[in-house]
Amino acid sequence: MAFDGAWKIDRNENYDKFMEKMGINVVKRKLAAHDNLKLIITQEGNKFTVKESSTFRNIEIVFELGVTFNYSLADGTELTGNWNLEGNKLVGKFQRVDNGKELNTVREIIGDEMVQTYVYEGVEAKRIFKKN
């Protein structure tokens, strides 16, 4: 699948405003903007494994398409939701455990980049990754 491989963060668009809307304090936002995030994504059928390493943490997330699971963001925000394939996009629909508000995420390959788009409370941000 096109998502398979090692990806390294290249740049962000509107990420600070997005994090602010999420309620992340200014110090954590400044650090997160330079988190040196790397993702290693592998897919076997409907099962995905995402190894995430950054300045903040190293974790492995395993999920199956369409199956609800729990996930914690780097700042500790707890989410529940699932990922699905919609055409060539990996679409995540999550809900914050603390306030019930939706956080939607889309991963798609555009050219030689993986673009991860987040939408929360009407604020959209993008994190753009290059193959490592």
From Swiss-Prot:
CDD domains: FABP2. Hexadecanoate binds at W83, R107. It is found in: Cytoplasm. Disulfide bonds: none annotated. Tetradecanoate binds at W83, R107. Its main location: cytoplasm. GO terms for molecular function: long-chain fatty acid binding. One of its GO terms (biological process) is fatty acid transport. GO terms for cellular component: cytosol; nucleus. The keyword Zinc-finger does not apply. Keywords: Acetylation, Cytoplasm, Lipid-binding, Transport. The modification N-acetylalanine is found at A2. PANTHER family: FATTY ACID BINDING PROTEIN. Belongs to the calycin superfamily. Fatty-acid binding protein (FABP) family. Forms a beta-barrel structure that accommodates the hydrophobic ligand in its interior. FABPs are thought to play a role in the intracellular transport of long-chain fatty acids and their acyl-CoA esters. FABP2 is probably involved in triglyceride-rich lipoprotein synthesis. Binds saturated long-chain fatty acids with a high affinity, but binds with a lower affinity to unsaturated long-chain fatty acids. FABP2 may also help maintain energy homeostasis by functioning as a lipid sensor. This is Fatty acid-binding protein, intestinal. It comes from Sus scrofa.
